From Swiss-Prot:
Keyword Glycoprotein set for record: yes
Localization (cell): Membrane
Enzyme Commission identifier(s): 1.-.-.-
Chain segments annotated as transmembrane: 5-27
GO MF annotation, one: oxidoreductase activity, acting on paired donors, with incorporation or reduction of molecular oxygen
Recorded metabolic or biological pathway in which this protein acts: Secondary metabolite biosynthesis
Residues modified by glycosylation: N66, N72, N495
Family statement drawn from the similarity comment of this UniProt entry: Belongs to the cytochrome P450 family.
PROSITE patterns assigned: CYTOCHROME_P450
Function: Cytochrome P450 monooxygenase; part of the gene cluster that mediates the biosynthesis fumihopaside A, a hopane-type glucoside that enhances the thermotolerance and UV resistance of N.fumigata. The first step of fumihopaside A biosynthesis is performed by the squalene hopane cyclase afumA that catalyzes the cyclization of 3S-oxidosqualene into the hopene 21-beta-H-hopane-3-beta,22-diol.
The name this protein goes by in its record: Cytochrome P450 monooxygenase afumB
Length: 508
């Protein structure tokens, strides 16, 4: 009996060993073919002696706490080149700002890289079925809820909604004194986007904001703050309590789900009663993103997560764009004067139309340049889901390919690619909107809204929203004067901003 059992165990182990050997051989063959086909060579390595990657973690954490993470990124690329390898907790990680590699990861070899493992743990608690928390078929399904809607910006861009937001903003701007525009921009965009997304705004600029909406807005802000913190702490975030974070996520989800169910009930009632008219509140909801998504699905959780995704991603990106733009305009009087003259000459002092905004060429240059100098998302990451490669960065001269093993992470830095003198000239660190006259950004690693299949679907809507607010402010105020002598200091959240805000005086 024991002999038969021993023979069976031996046979099983033998077969297992053979399978392992065959798989190992096949993997070596695949890797060999990749190396030969793309001339792969090892890139330069940051601290090759730091085998466990502990020094890297210490250094990165120190720079993050000292608010010098971005200057450190620039220094590392200057030292090791546009692509280099490092180790973080024994894992080999690749950093790149080479436009060729960025396009490769986001576009050419999109299917070789996943995003969810990088950020799913951040977004899943608040949008478990949203596009930032999933990959593959589930990602395609979640993204499809937005695709057709955002492809028709003229149809969904509500000019009156934008004007209402501006009127709420203007009431908060004092005459004859300095003020920080950054928190006002955040409130403006949150109010407009929540009204667009749900048909009912969170009213953060209003004096009579309800307690419920105040709690939801605060919960949303807190959740985003913790998501940003945990994103930069990486695995270390598990050492910190997330109890309050989870509670904030539930507050946001519960409120949005209540709005979703209310709209679904109203739809069903109108369908059954054949009601010809609706009240003002319902009319607003029928024009909202929520209502348009409900035209495609009745999955409550999918709709809820789609709406919450807009509240998270859409709010921070537009608020960051506005704050960065006005920070720079306050320090470049010539640009502000030129932009104001274009607006007055082509639009006048009346609220702009959709076509007015689309034709504001110099304004688009200003936004492009602001997002180039201070990228909204200074770095991002993808994880290889198979053995693959990068087209550049290997070898002594950095012109060979780089082998990327399955499970290894590639971190690409728009902070580096947007500020590259090779792409944007010797004055790449200067704010000069005129550089965009005739400049094609496709091959320059310019990715303020990402690129490829994961490109931001709402980028045109975001630009329209930021444009409307900017035009109305510049129409109203003759001058924008800087009132802050402090240098720009990084504040890395879900989007990049200046820690010191936008302290200015707006002069009629």
């Amino acid at each position: 009996m024991y002999t038969a059992l021993g023979l069976a165990v031996f046979t099983a182990l033998f077969h297992y060993t053979i399978v392992l050997a065959i798989n190992h051989y096949r993997t070596r063959e695949i890797l060999s073919q990749l190396v030969k086909a793309h001339n792969c060579c090892p890139p330069k390595t940051e601290r090759p002696w730091d085998i466990l990657g502990l020094v890297k973690i210490y250094s990165s954490t120190k720079h993050l706490l000292n608010e010098t993470a971005l200057s450190n990124v620039s220094a590392l690329f200057k030292c090791y080149g546009d692509t280099y390898a490092s180790r973080i907790l024994t894992q080999r990680v690749y950093f790149t700002c080479d436009p060729r590699n960025i396009r490769h990861v986001l576009i050419n070899r999109f299917s070789d890289f996943d995003a969810s493992d990088v950020r799913a743990h951040l977004f899943a608690p608040i949008t478990p079925h949203g596009i930032f928390a999933v990959d593959g078929a589930e990602w395609k399904e979640a993204r499809s809820l937005y695709a057709d809607i955002f492809s028709a910006t003229r149809k969904i861009f509500d000019l009156q909604l934008q004007e209402d937001g501006f009127q709420g903003l203007i009431k908060q701007i004092p005459r004859g004194q300095a003020m920080d525009l950054a928190p006002l921009f955040l409130k403006l965009v949150l109010d407009v986007n929540s009204a667009f997304a749900m048909g009912t705004g969170l009213d953060t600029l209003k004096q009579d904001q309800s307690l419920e909406k105040k709690e939801v807005a605060e919960a949303l802000m807190y959740a985003k703050k913790i998501m940003a913190r945990d994103g930069f702490l990486g695995p270390l975030h598990y050492l910190l309590s997330r109890k309050d974070f989870y509670a904030a996520c539930e507050t946001v989800k519960a409120y949005v789900e209540k709005v979703v169910r209310k709209e679904m009930t109203a739809r069903e009632y109108q369908k059954q009663s054949n009601a010809a008219t609706v009240d003002d509140e319902r009319q607003k909801r029928t024009q909202s993103l929520l209502s348009r998504i409900l035209d495609n699905t009745n999955d409550v959780h999918a709709v809820r997560d789609a709406v919450v995704t807009i509240l998270i991603a859409g709010t921070d990106s537009v608020a960051s764009m506005l704050s960065t733009t006005f920070y720079l305009l306050a320090r470049h009087e010539r640009v502000y004067a030129k932009l104001r003259q274009e607006i007055l000459d082509t639009i006048g002092t009346e609220p702009p139309t959709y076509d007015n905004i689309r034709k504001a060429t110099y304004l688009r240059y200003v936004f492009n340049e602001a997002m180039r100098v201070y990228p909204p998302v200074p770095f991002n990451a993808r994880t290889a889901n198979r053995d693959t490669y990068l087209p550049a960065g290997g070898g002594p001269d950095g012109q060979s390919g780089v082998l990327i093993r399955k499970g290894q992470r590639v971190i690409f830095a728009s902070w580096g690619s947007h500020r590259s003198t090779r792409s944007f000239g010797a004055d790449a660190l200067e704010f000069r909107p005129e550089r965009w006259e005739g400049l094609k950004s496709e091959s320059l690693g310019y990715i303020p809204f990402s690129a490829g299949p994961r490109v931001c679907l709402g980028q045109q809507y975001a630009l329209l929203e930021a444009s409307y607010a900017t035009i109305r402010i510049i129409q109203t105020f003759e001058r924008l004067e800087n009132r802050d002598v402090r240098p720009w200091t990084e504040k890395i959240g879900l989007n990049l901003s200046n820690k010191n805000g936008v302290l200015v005086e707006l002069v009629h």
